[in-house]
Structures are given as structure tokens and as C-alpha cells.
Amino acid sequence: MDIVNDLVSSISSISSEAAEEEAIRDELRNDKGGLIAGIFVLTLTASFVPWFLTKAKITNLVSVVSILTCLSAGVIIGAGFNHILPDAAEEFQSYVEAVAPDNKYGDFPFAHTITIVTMFALICVDKILVSGGLDGEADHNHMDLSQHNHPSPHAAGEIDLNIYTNGDDDDDDVNEDQEEDSTKDDEKEHGHGHGHGHGHNSSNSSSNGHGHGLKKKKKSKKEHGHGHNHDHSSNGHSHKDEKDSEKVNVSSKSKAWVFLVALSLHSIFDGLGLGSETQKDSFYGLLIAVLAHKFLDGLVLGIAIKYAYFSFKFSCIALVFAAAMTPLGIGIGMAISSAYESSTDAYLVKGIILSITCGSFIYISLIELLPSGLCQKGWPKLKLAVAFLGYSVMAILALWV
């Protein structure tokens, strides 16, 4: 009789555990469905922020984005090493125990190896894309916003992304005033103004005779000599300026393309990890990391696309495409997880997907986000502090999530 009771109790326990796991899967399935729409809207909205702020006079956008970028990098590093990588290693361990518990290679760090291989693969793809020549440049930084610090002069009223050049015009005005005062002093000292002969000008370039001199920089307000000093710079350099402007525009378009491809690839890996995750705590830990940088991803991509001066129609198509990549990855991950749900191969599949996701996290945080945030001028100590803060928060959350 006791044996029968124990058997019934065991069956009931197994049934209750199965029912609980099924309830968790249903809950996560519903959350993932809502997440598909939520992440798409979040990323797309962030991508169009530069257009929303076109008429606003914002002078510190680069500094704000760079600080948030460092914070996001810290969060992603913490999520990768404290959440995703341990879960991936656990999945591989479960697979080995279920299939070949006595295998002598069971303790091999499969998760860590796949993670590092993925990181190097992404670096190789990145460098091959650029060095192969979309614009023929040897080096770049996808998220370096300094290239967008000087928007087109035709875009009047648009955002000034460089807070470190605001004082340049004032300095030029001061220099002009100083040059004008110096010119007046010279006039008084030498006792002649607009006569023939050897004259003086405030830009340290002398003109003989009638003073037909060429100037590389802008003319001083007052000049000595005969007064016939001609400035040929506007005509002589107009074609060169047009070529330089065209070259910069092509470079901006190429970098925007590269960033679009790289970000889309990384977004698919984000979605794969979220879609394949079946553990509630691990899912929400990964979700925090993904949401921490999705807004920034969209914002920086929007800046890159906007200041590459594509047509608005093409920009919309590109941004919608990029925003759809994480939801696409979630859907693929859910399909893979469902296909292997009742098989021991599910451990292997989830372990591989999580390891790839972790590798992409390390790449995007240490290769792209953190260097990009630190390369912008200003607040280096604050940026390092917020990066460590982001990591610390995710490390502490690993105690419960």
C-alpha cells in the first residue's frame, strides 16, 4: 500500500512540475509576443528622434549620447558575463549529462569557446566589410558621432551636435577685434594710412606696391597699402570645396550602410537569445540588457542615417528594416525552441544560441559601444564610472535574476 501511495505521489509531483513548466512557457510566450511589438516601436521611435529634434537648438547631444553609451556598454557586459554565459554553460552541461554523462570532453568550456569565436567572427566581418571597400577606409568607428558634428550648411536650424566648437566663432570675433586694434596702432605708429609703397595688414601677410596679395585665411577688417588687395580664395577653392563635400557625403553614406548591416546582424542575435530562453529568471535578466541599449542603438543609427543625407523615403525603409531585426530574431528563437522543446537537443540548441548571443554582446559592448563613448571629448571619469555602474547593477541582479 505504501508503495502505491509513493508511486501516486511521484506521478502527482511530476505532473505538477510539468504543469508549472507549461504555465511558465505560456507566460513567457505571451511576454515574447508583446515584446516583439514593444521592441519594434521602441527602436523605431528612437531612430526618428534626430528628425523630431531637427528644429531644436540642442548643443550637447553628443555628450549625452556618449555618457549613455558607456552606461549601456557596462550593462551589456554585465548581462553577457553574469547572465547569458552561465546559462549557456548550464545548457551544455545539461546536454552532456543527458546524452553522454561519462564523456571525457564533458567539462570542455563549449559556451566560452563559441562566445569568443562569435566575437572574433563579428570583428572579421566588420573589418572585411570596411577594408573591402564600401568607402575604402582602413579604420572606422560605427558609433563615433564626431563625423556628424558639422551638418550641412544648407540645413539651417538643424541640431548642432558639437558642443566643443561653440566657442570658435566667439574666439574669431575676439581675434578680429584684436587685429583691428593692432591695425589702428600700426597706423598711428607708422604715420601713414592708404599711401603707395610698402603696406601692412593684420593677418601678417605683406603686399608690395599696390598690395595685390592672396590670403589663405579670412581678410582682416582693415588693410594698409593701396587698398586693391583682392581675395581669390572663394573662386579658387570653390571646386575643391565641392569635391571635398562630395567625398565626405559618400563616406557618411558608406559608414551608415556598414552600421546598418552590423546593427541588424547584432539585433538578430539579441532576438535569438530572447526567443529561445525558457527560464523565467534568465529571460528577464536578458531582457533588461537588451532594452538597455535598444533605444541607444536606434538613436545612433538614426543620427548616422540622417546625416548621411539619404532621401527621407529611403531613411524610413532602412530604419524600419533595422527595427524589425530584433523581433525577427525573437520569432526565430521561439520557433527553434518550440521545435526542440521535447528533445534533449533543446539543451544543445539553446546553449549554442545563448553563446552566440553572448559573443555578440561582448563585441557590441567592448568593440563598439565603450570605445565610441570614450572617444568623444569630455567627462572621461564620469563615463568610466557609469560603465562600471552598469556592470555592477547587472552583477547584483544576477543574485536574484
Curated annotation (Swiss-Prot):
Location in the cell: Membrane
GO MF annotations, alphabetized: metal ion binding; zinc ion transmembrane transporter activity
Pfam families: Zip
Assigned keywords, A-Z: Ion transport, Membrane, Metal-binding, Transmembrane, Transmembrane helix, Transport
Topology in membrane: Multi-pass membrane protein
Sequence ranges of Basic residues compositional bias: 212-225
Membrane-spanning residues: 33-53, 61-81, 114-134, 256-276, 285-305, 316-336, 351-371, 381-401
Low complexity bias (residue ranges): 200-209
Sequence ranges of Basic and acidic residues compositional bias: 226-247
Signal sequence range: none
Bias type Acidic residues, positions: 167-184
GO cellular component terms, A-Z: plasma membrane
Stretches for region Disordered: 141-247
Record has Ribonucleoprotein as a keyword: no
Protein family according to the UniProt entry: Belongs to the ZIP transporter (TC 2.A.5) family.
Name the record gives this protein: Protein zntC
Gene: zntC
